[in-house]
From Swiss-Prot:
PANTHER family: DEXAMETHASONE-INDUCED PROTEIN. InterPro entries: Dexamethasone-induced (IPR023259). This is Dexamethasone-induced protein. It comes from Mus musculus (Mouse). Belongs to the DEXI family. It holds the Pfam family Dexa_ind. The gene is Dexi.
Length: 95
């Protein structure tokens, strides 16, 4: 049978197309996601550095007055946040 001989001869030659590895899309997606997260962290720390170190140059001499101008403090003489003022509110309640 000549067809069987041809088929055996073709089987001996091996596959006509070499094996192609499937693409690495899922793993490459996670590699890309990792680098995007690294870039986000880099820019977050860069912004923090700029705000904390470069921004300190532009702070005024009178920090209390600057906080009043921003609306953080209502009275320049009050100073920064005082934790003892909260206790005065509860003095009558606890007795």
């Amino acid at each position: 049978m000549p067809g069987a001989r041809v088929a055996a001869h073709l089987d001996a030659l091996g596959p006509l197309v070499s094996y192609v590895q499937p693409p690495l899309l899922p793993s490459m997606f996670y590699v890309g996601l990792f680098f995007v997260n690294v870039l986000i962290l880099y820019y977050a720390f860069l912004m923090e550095y700029i705000v904390l170190n470069v921004g300190l140059v532009f702070l005024p001499e009178d920090l209390d007055q600057a906080l009043v101008d921003l609306g953080v403090l209502s009275d320049p003489g009050s100073g920064l946040y005082d934790a003892d003022s909260e206790l005065d509110v509860f003095d009558g309640y606890l007795e």
